[in-house]
């Protein structure tokens, strides 16, 4: 919700404080040189950087607020590594110690393989792929790893397990044995989702035990339920289940104390409204009280006027197969005032869209409250938003807060710009889009359509509809996130082709919707398979969502050939033959997905996801991988951050300026040096 849309249709195109300086330098220097969008490429990853347009025009207090919030965003980096897997931190630190201290030959194939492995670990915030969640397979030998570790002075290695020998006895099997911790998040039907997942939100606890534990906590009929379990690790100690709460005197305390320090600095330069919001977040971090988290979210969602805004906290539950526990993430941003006008039009007409939605009337909101939307430029990415980041966000996640106070939706303009600019001329459209008219539409309207899809998905899709009386919202369990993303996507797809979009001046004509439909269906049924290892099922939430929608629409429209698989010169393409009928199908599908969510119909939701969103046609998969590989395109992208530095005069900050890191490796090592506050074992 909510972190919606991590490159959605764009996947089709590409599929401690810093030192201060005394001399004020003109900010324009950052923009005068030709901008380098691509910083690094390795394996299936392309690392980009993003512009920060308009930063120089902010007031000094706004710049200082961004700077302090940036420091808070970077201070939690270790948390997401540890949440993803309990051995990520000692492994990362061992690899970094090798990289910075090894004095041997750095030109060999095995060294290059080691370097690639380290870059992948940085990118994924751990040893499991950030998207598929499969464990990485090192392309260097255990013997070579032993040689590398032996070359590092003992004092440079993590000491949490004792000697270097004791350290490697633990981490070496974890790295090299494919049977150990093979997947970070397992969603396979019939498995114990906790015991078969490597994520670190539970320790020694079975799925049945966890579900029963939180079922006992829930208060039936509570109109304002807290998000039980959101900010804790559930463990079994002496045979008894207990929560280790993430707070400044609990688990992750050293990092959370640093985050709070910088939030306190931010509160000093914030407006009165934002100061109250930040202080509520500080209270939540200090107490771990989820009622304080709700208070923070209510204050945050009601603040729609601030130029500078942020996300900081335990937010999204995609990393927990049961959907209780949230990863730590952060993002600091400020408004793009010109682009925000389009989202203001959408939010101003939210009631019209709700009233005309094809869902059952009883599941429509009678009064849409507090829908706010804006277009932003990211200033920093952190935690689970870094290096891979969403292009749109809709928060808060609690259904009762959304119903009573509304939601805040953002489209991240400078991130979508970086994706688009870095993907120009890569040959993708020519290879996978069969019809010339579809190619032309996507070339002309693809970016407009992607941005509008994101706006509708985040601003209206997630905020639409309501639960039936007595439904809590967690009944769909491991399928809840997929179905929620599908609900928002279907809402967006349905309205993309509505005449209201042209009437409101949001889209120039119906060709934009056709471009979006053609690219979305092709991506969902086919081209996103470039992101999946051959022989694997689809595991990632957004990919399951897109495949489910596309395959379901294909089957529903099969009799009338609404969508067609075309084979020409041995190459498969997906073609939409009837855009109007496809829109009608999207409406029917939205009606059913909303019913499933509103009623908490686990069986129907499970059957939809498992039937259409998981399994992969091996022959088609092989074809996609072969064709995609010939283009030399990396299917995943992420980012390095700008580096912000205070300009000092007489001991006072008089400006904040920014520059870009020299390399991806430089930034990762810098962050590990200056923002690593947790022990290796937590």
Predicted features by range, described:
Residues 16-19:
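C-terminal motif of bacterial Sec signal peptides marking the signal peptidase cleavage site
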Residues 459-471, 495, 499:
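Catalytic Zn2+-binding segment of zinc metalloproteases
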Residues 123-235, 241-440, 446:
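Contiguous, non-catalytic segments that form substrate-binding/exosite surfaces or channel walls
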Residues 578-682:
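Extended, compositionally biased alpha-helical segments that mediate assembly or anchoring
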Residues 465-486:
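Post-HEXXH active-site segment of zinc metalloproteases
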Residues 80, 493-599:
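Long, well-structured alpha-helical subdomains associated
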Residues 59, 271, 481-498:
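An active-site-proximal "capping" alpha-helix that borders the catalytic cofactor pocket
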Residues 30-94:
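N-terminal-proximal low-complexity accessory segments that begin disordered
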């Amino acid at each position: 919700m909510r972190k919606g849309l991590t490159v959605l249709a764009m996947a089709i195109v590409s599929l401690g404080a810093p030192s201060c300086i005394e001399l004020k330098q003109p900010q324009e220097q950052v923009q005068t040189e030709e901008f380098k969008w691509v910083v690094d490429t390795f394996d299936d990853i392309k690392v980009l950087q993003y512009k920060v347009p308009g930063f120089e025009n902010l007031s000094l207090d706004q710049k200082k607020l961004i700077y302090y919030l940036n420091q808070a965003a970077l201070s939690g980096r270790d948390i997401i590594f540890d949440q993803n897997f309990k051995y990520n931190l000692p492994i990362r630190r061992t690899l970094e110690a090798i990289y910075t201290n090894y004095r041997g030959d750095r030109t060999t194939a095995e060294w290059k393989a080691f370097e690639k492995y380290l870059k992948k670990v940085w990118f994924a915030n751990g040893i499991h792929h950030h998207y598929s969640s499969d464990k990485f397979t090192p392309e260097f030998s255990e013997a070579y790893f032993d040689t590398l570790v032996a070359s590092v002075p003992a004092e440079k290695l993590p000491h949490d397990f004792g000697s270097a020998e004791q350290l490697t006895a633990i981490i070496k099997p974890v790295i090299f044995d494919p049977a150990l911790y093979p997947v970070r998040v397992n969603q396979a039907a019939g498995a114990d989702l906790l015991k078969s997942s490597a994520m670190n939100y539970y320790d020694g606890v079975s799925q049945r035990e966890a579900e029963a534990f939180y079922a006992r906590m829930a208060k039936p009929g509570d109109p304002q339920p807290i998000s039980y379990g959101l900010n804790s690790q559930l463990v079994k100690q002496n045979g008894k289940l207990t929560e280790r709460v993430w707070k400044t005197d609990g688990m992750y305390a050293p990092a959370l104390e640093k985050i709070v320090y910088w939030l306190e600095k931010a509160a000093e330069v914030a407006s009165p409204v934002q100061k109250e919001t930040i202080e509520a977040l500080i209270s939540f971090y200090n107490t771990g009280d989820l009622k304080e988290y709700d208070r923070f979210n209510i204050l945050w969602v009601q603040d729609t006027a601030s130029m500078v805004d942020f996300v900081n906290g335990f937010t999204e539950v995609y990393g927990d197969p049961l959907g209780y526990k949230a990863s730590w993430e952060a993002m600091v941003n400020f408004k793009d005032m010109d682009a925000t006008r389009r989202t203001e039009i959408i939010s101003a007409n939210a009631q019209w869209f709700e009233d005309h939605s094809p869902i059952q009337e009883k599941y429509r909101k009678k009064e849409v409250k507090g829908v706010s939307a804006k277009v932003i430029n990211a200033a920093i990415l952190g935690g689970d938003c870094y290096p891979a980041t969403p292009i749109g966000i809709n928060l808060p996640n609690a259904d009762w807060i959304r119903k009573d106070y509304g939601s805040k939706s953002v489209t991240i303009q400078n991130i979508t710009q970086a994706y688009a600019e870095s993907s120009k001329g890569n040959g993708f459209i020519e290879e996978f889009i069969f019809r010339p008219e579809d190619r032309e539409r996507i070339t002309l309207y693809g970016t407009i359509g992607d941005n509008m899809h994101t706006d509708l998905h985040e601003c209206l899709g997630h905020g639409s509809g309501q639960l039936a009386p007595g439904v809590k919202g967690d009944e769909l369990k491991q399928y809840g996130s997929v179905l929620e993303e599908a609900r928002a996507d279907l809402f967006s797809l349905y309205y993309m082709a509505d005449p209201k979009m042209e009437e409101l001046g949001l889209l120039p004509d119906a060709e934009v919707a056709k471009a979006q439909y053609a690219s979305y269906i092709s991506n969902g049924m086919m081209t996103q398979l470039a992101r999946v290892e051959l022989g694997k099922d689809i595991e990632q939430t957004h990919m399951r969502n897109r495949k489910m929608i596309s395959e379901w629409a294909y089957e529903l429209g099969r009799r009338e050939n609404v969508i067609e698989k075309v084979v020409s010169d041995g190459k498969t393409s997906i073609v939409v033959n009837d855009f109007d009928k496809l829109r009608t199908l999207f409406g029917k599908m939205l009606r059913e997905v909303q019913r499933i969510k509103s009623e908490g119909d686990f069986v129907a939701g499970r059957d939809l996801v498992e039937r259409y969103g998981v399994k992969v046609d091996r022959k088609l998969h092989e074809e996609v991988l072969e064709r995609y590989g010939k283009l030399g395109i990396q299917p995943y992208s992420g980012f390095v951050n700008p580096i912000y530095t205070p300009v000092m005069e007489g001991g006072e900050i008089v400006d904040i300026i920014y520059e870009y890191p020299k390399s991806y490796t430089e930034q990762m090592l810098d962050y590990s040096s200056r923002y690593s506050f947790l022990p290796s074992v937590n």
